[in-house]
Amino acid sequence: MSSRYGERRGDPGICDLTFGNPHEMPLAGLVTALRERAMPKHKDWFAYKTSEKESQAFLAQRLQSELALPFEPSDIALTTGAFAAIMVAFHIVLNAGDEAVISEPAWFCYEPMLLAADAVPRKVKLKFPNFDLDLSAIEAAIGPKTRLVIVNTPHNPTGRIYDDNTLKALAELLERASERYGHRVFLLSDEPYRRLRFNGRGFTSPATFYPWTLISYSYGKILLAPGQRIGYLATSPSMPFKERKALSNVMFSTQMALGWCFPNAIMQYAVPDLESLSIDLAALTRRRDSLAAALTKAGYEVLLPDGTFYLWAKWPEGNPQTHWNRLADRNVFVLPGSLMNTTDYFRISFTASDSMIERALPAFSEVTADPISPSLRPIETRPAIGT
């Protein structure tokens, strides 16, 4: 993938459905906020910034309302996006050789980030065909070295939002595992797509049911501005004080040691502005429905997402590598599921423009209509930078 896609990336003639990148101009409100916050109000405006108290207090209040949990400002660590939040979480919870459970298909950066933290990924599969959490598989994967289970909701790449019953059962099995092995198994709830939900779909954070939860969040998704790095790592306010305090005590030093994982001054000043902004959910819904209908008609199996801006679909019968190349031959690029260890599927990002999606649709039909492929070039499975 990386060679063919890399050669064409940015070419106006292609239909780029790979990553969650913008294909239209940024939100006007974002531009205005950054312009206004760039104007210094005092001499320390651009001095070193950690987690600013004003930002922490604002976010604690917003999270109290959004997640119905009594967050305090000290529970919020501002980070340079969810990447940094996740890496900090790995380092404050895991020691060298500790294990973390991942449910696949999964975001392809979890595994290398765990390895970089000297931790050991333990992989289980989501349940087919709806890609729900396989709680039995998760429980079986937890062993004496397991310190962390990672859950991503809404889920990339499938768009699934896990329901309350599933999350309650997950909390119960984590309690059992913690008792069984005599140490706490933490939960990382990765929630960067939390506000990107369709048709009024509700959302419950796993932190509602399991006190030993850390929440990672990024503004890059709701703003469709992944190049402006800001997010946070939130510690559940339900976590017992002793453990909460222990994590808080190492948070600053870990963020510093990992390369100053604090957002820049302008982004922190802009937090109240960012909270009121969103990309056009109605447009995303329209693109989702258009793609899902067209692909289903063309013979693909499509999982309609509850959230995110991705469509997860199964290739028709045949060689997935061949199908991917046939789309690329028609100037359409998607993310192969092999990057997420699920070869028979692929992911479409519908952050693409309406015109780009409209141009891409005939190619999907052509791939299923003609079983003979003119292209047998292999897919290279090194992901480009992106999500």
PLM-predicted stretches and their roles:
Residues 43-179, 194-209, 357, 376-386:
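Conserved core of the PLP fold type I
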Residues 5-8, 66-68, 173-184, 237-244:
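Alpha-helix termini
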Residues 1-81, 88, 274-278, 371, ...:
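N-terminal small-domain helix-loop-helix segment of the aminotransferase-like
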Residues 265-272, 284-295, 302-314, 340, ...:
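Conserved glycine-rich beta-strand-loop-beta hairpin in the small C-terminal domain of fold type I
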Residues 14-16, 216, 301-307, 338-339:
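Short beta-strand
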Residues 65, 139, 326-335, 339-387:
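PLP-dependent enzyme catalytic core of the Aspartate aminotransferase-like
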Residues 211-285, 368:
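Conserved core segment of the aminotransferase class I/II
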